[in-house]
């Protein structure tokens, strides 16, 4: 059986690590190469802080998963916007797919830095695509799919109960704006470089080892510690999506021929108010 390699940028992150752990359990997986700059965006002095990066690939009880982590994952500490780093990795391992999850997390939205968001969503994307294009021109290697993890924040305010992929995109925050710009770069590159892509738009991901201070994590920790659940914007609706469902859907879209050069919302498909989420936690 032919073994396939996969590169996961931001592979120590919440979504990237979940995708990686699913990939390494596939029989045809050779190596999963994680490229991550090991940056911690959360203040370690905050009461909610736990460095889940250390837990995502350690203290694993599942023996098969633990064995595969030790045998199939290669870690690189580096900046995905660095041409030399990414070119060297991509040329060496010639991955079947690149899962580009690296970006400044949404937690930074309260203190936005435009250049930081641009580097996370745009500069890294351009650099990786540049490297892939150059390697393909110099060899017989052809990448199977470039998977770009975008965000439902590209839509801005939801005008309907459920968002569809071809709905208007009017992001309100710099995060969504940069993610949307990244999408257009991926599509533009594909037109002249013939790099097949899949764009994924997650929404309100939650689950084990989330440390990005999303509202789901914040309220859950409050509930565990018998704290008061303070709700702001109680009528605001979010399409909460379990991270393992998101990872599974992303991998299926990446491996399916019908997912080539397509964009997918991977969400639960219906909104739930933050207040109703809090009531569930109180039970």
Predicted regions and their residues:
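Hydrophobic alpha-helix immediately C-terminal to the catalytic Tyr-X-X-X-Lys motif of short-chain
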Residues: 181, 185, 189, 219, ...
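Conserved sequence/active-site signature of Rossmann-fold short-chain dehydrogenase/reductase
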Residues: 81, 154-155, 205-207, 236, ...
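Glycine/proline-rich active-site loop of Rossmann-fold NAD(P)-dependent oxidoreductases
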Residues: 29, 180, 205-218, 227, ...
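Hydrophobic "lid"/C-terminal helical patch
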Residues: 19, 247-254, 278-281
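Short aromatic-enriched loop/helix-cap "lid" or pocket-rim segments at secondary-structure transitions
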Residues: 43-48, 158-161, 210-213, 244, ...
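N-terminal Rossmann-like NAD(P)+-binding domain of SDR-like oxidoreductases, especially those catalyzing
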Residues: 1-201
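Protein kinase-like catalytic domain
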Residues: 133, 190, 224, 254-255
């Amino acid at each position: 059986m032919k073994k396939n390699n996969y590169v996961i940028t931001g592979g120590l992150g919440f979504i990237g690590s979940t995708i990686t752990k699913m990939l390494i359990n596939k029989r045809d997986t050779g190596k999963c190469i994680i490229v991550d700059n090991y940056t911690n965006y959360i203040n370690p002095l905050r009461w909610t802080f736990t460095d889940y990066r250390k837990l995502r690939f350690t203290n694993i009880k599942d023996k098969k998963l633990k064995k595969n982590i030790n045998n199939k994952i290669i870690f690189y500490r580096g900046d995905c916007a660095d041409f030399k780093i990414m070119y060297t990795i991509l040329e060496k391992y010639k991955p079947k797919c690149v899962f580009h999850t690296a970006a400044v997390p949404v937690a930074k939205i309260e203190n936005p830095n435009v250049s930081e968001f641009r580097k996370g969503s745009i500069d890294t994307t351009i650099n990786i695509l540049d490297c892939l294009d150059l390697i393909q021109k110099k060899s017989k290697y052809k990448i199977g799919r470039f998977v770009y993890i975008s965000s439902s924040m590209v839509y801005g305010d939801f005008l309907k109960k459920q968002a569809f992929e071809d709905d208007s995109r009017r992001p309100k925050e710099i995060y969504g704006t940069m993610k949307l710009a990244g999408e257009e770069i991926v599509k533009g590159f594909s037109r002249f470089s013939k790099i097949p892509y899949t764009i994924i738009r997650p929404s309100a991901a939650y689950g084990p080892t989330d440390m990005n201070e999303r509202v789901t994590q914040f309220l859950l920790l409050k509930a565990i510690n018998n704290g008061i659940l303070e709700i702001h914007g109680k009528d605001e609706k979010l399409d909460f999506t379990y991270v393992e469902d998101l990872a599974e859907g992303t991998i299926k879209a990446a491996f399916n021929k019908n997912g080539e050069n397509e964009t997918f919302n991977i969400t639960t498909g219906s909104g739930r108010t933050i207040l109703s989420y809090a009531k569930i936690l109180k039970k």
